[in-house]
């Protein structure tokens, strides 16, 4: 993947994550709207993880804690998770 594509993926993930959180706050019991954003996030994170299931799963879970922290923080968390997995 090119650096440009990776940057766009991070931006899209952060935007969808905020949309998911906002949808949940606006209508906590409207699961179809929440699910729509959740499905998009899943596809984006799967693409970003490029076949690494552990990375995909851990980053997806981390998104719940970093919803409002922006793209730079998402990249930092992703890099830390990648490094931790590589180090075993």
Curated annotation (Swiss-Prot):
<protein>
    <recommendedName>
        <fullName>Gene 85 protein</fullName>
    </recommendedName>
</protein>
């Amino acid at each position: 993947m090119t650096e440009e594509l990776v940057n766009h993926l991070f931006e899209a993930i952060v935007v969808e994550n905020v949309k998911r959180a906002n949808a949940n706050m606006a209508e906590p019991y409207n699961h179809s709207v929440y699910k729509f954003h959740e499905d998009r996030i899943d596809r984006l994170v799967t693409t970003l993880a490029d076949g690494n299931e552990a990375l995909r799963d851990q980053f997806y879970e981390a998104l719940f804690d970093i919803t409002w922290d922006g793209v730079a923080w998402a990249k930092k968390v992703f890099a830390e998770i990648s490094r931790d997995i590589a180090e075993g």
